[in-house]
Swiss-Prot record:
Its EC number is 3.6.1.41. Belongs to the Ap4A hydrolase family. It is an enzyme of class 3 (hydrolase). Hydrolyzes diadenosine 5',5'''-P1,P4-tetraphosphate to yield ADP. GO terms for molecular function: bis(5'-nucleosyl)-tetraphosphatase (symmetrical) activity. Keywords: Hydrolase. InterPro entries: ApaH, Calcineurin-like_PHP_ApaH, Metallo-depent_PP-like. Pfam families: Metallophos. This is Bis(5'-nucleosyl)-tetraphosphatase, symmetrical. SUPFAM superfamilies: Metallo-dependent phosphatases. The gene is apaH. CDD domains: MPP_ApaH (cd07422). It catalyses: P(1),P(4)-bis(5'-adenosyl) tetraphosphate + H2O = 2 ADP + 2 H(+).
Length: 288
């Protein structure tokens, strides 16, 4: 009975299969936690979603920014990008079922017994655990409602970038979504910086990685996150694990076994084409 964590899959189905076979994952007794960004950039997003859905209650997922973007494309809010390789998923006969299943997934997972917290990008030092749970619940509630397309319209905004209990409901949703799915750096006062994507030793002053600022949550929980592939799983404090190691970019898919803290990595099968191009997709299984 083991607990496994896997970093961002990004449609890398073959690598996912290989790493699960390597640890002899058994969905009847083991639990698999996934850091989000299940889809896009890799070649097999459809197969990844189908596989994860079949695993049922043995899997605990959080949504990443690419998963939310996929929902925005499916609803016709955003245009599909050829580099995401998601047309087979968007036009599949079971696309609607998969999209509905996806939007019912959480943005935060917490195991209070093991004292583990998982979010795709991380947790802002401005929150305590109760605020984090409340903000996650607000996002999950709107995603599961009929008005979720209206919410998806706003997920590309960078403001507000500072937490306050006085924020409006819409502003709370935007800030929380950026924390859970897009955040990397903060200013010393906790204010989010949504622009810098460099590795920490190249980031301009006074920016700090979110995990290097004092936090009541970090003091009490181990934190698992993905999103930040350029970290290569390194440079985080004790008890904080960054598991995105850029499989879709020709890097590796990373698995952490919680019980012995052993790290297993599977090399990407090939480097992906980073050239950005676009294909018009107008939602609900239609493409031009």
């Amino acid at each position: 009975m083991s607990t496994y964590f896997i970093g961002d899959i990004h449609g890398c189905y073959d690598e996912l299969q290989t790493i699960l076979e390597k640890v002899a994952f058994d969905p009847l007794i083991d639990t698999l936690w996934l850091t989000g960004d299940l889809v896009a950039r890799g070649p097999s997003s459809l197969e990844v979603l189908r596989m994860i859905r079949r695993l049922g209650n043995s899997v605990r997922i959080v949504l990443g920014n690419h998963d939310l973007h996929l929902l925005a494309v499916y609803t016709g809010i955003m245009r599909n990008r050829i580099k995401d390789h998601t047309i087979p998923l968007l036009t599949a006969p079971d696309a609607e079922d998969l999209m509905n299943w996806l939007r019912y997934q959480p943005v935060l997972q917490v195991d209070n017994k093991k004292k583990i917290l998982m979010a795709h990008a991380g947790i802002t030092p401005q929150w305590n655990i109760d605020t984090a749970l409340q903000c996650a619940s607000e996002i999950e509630t709107v995603l599961r409602s009929e008005s979720y397309p209206l919410f998806l319209h706003s997920i590309y905004e960078d403001i507000p970038n500072y937490w306050s209990n006085e924020l409006s409901y819409r502003a709370r949703l935007q800030f929380s979504t950026n924390v859970f799915t897009r955040m990397r750096y903060c200013f010393p006062n906790g204010k989010l910086d949504m622009l810098c994507k460099d590795i920490p030793n190249k980031a301009p002053e006074p920016l700090r990685p979110w995990f290097n600022l004092p936090s009541t949550i970090v003091e009490k929980y181990s934190i698992i996150f993905g999103h930040w592939s350029s970290l290569l799983g390194k440079g985080t404090p004790t008890g904080i694990y960054g598991l995105d190691t850029g499989c879709c970019w020709g890097g590796k898919l990373t698995l952490l076994c919680w019980e012995d803290k052993k790290i297993i990595q599977i090399p990407s099968q090939k480097k992906r084409n980073k050239k950005c191009s676009y294909l018009c997709y107008n939602g609900k299984g239609k493409k031009n």
